[in-house]
Amino acid sequence: MLSSKALLAGNGAEDCGGFIARYRTMPTQALSLKTAARLDVEPASDLGLITVLLQNKGDNRALRAELDLVLSNSAGRMSSLRMREIMDGGQPLYVAIFDYKMGEDLTFALTVNVSGEPPRSFKFVERLN
């Protein structure tokens, strides 16, 4: 079984009002074979993974949502990524796979729609090595 804590170790976080969005990006080659199989990911040197966990500020429970993610590379090429929901220990975790070149700056623009909350958008830049 996956562990959200393990996938989000060294993560970034964004305060989104009533909830916190915790995220992490990593090369798929950094995944254990067991985790890669669970995520249905074939590790490759040019594939990255993003994970997003949404936690209610009041009780830390994981929240379900609709997520829209747009990735821009250093050349300005934009692509919309499909975020898949997987259940991890009874909690929803959102994942997507993306292409990248080692050492390239990638801008992730994420919009999160949690029921009962206004949509929240934020950006962050990562470089995978």
What is the predicted role of each segment?
Residues S3-A9:
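N-terminal signal peptide c-region/cleavage motif recognized by signal peptidases
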Residues A9-L49:
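Beta-strand-rich domain onsets/edges
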Residues D68-R82:
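Short amphipathic beta-strand segments in non-cytosolic proteins
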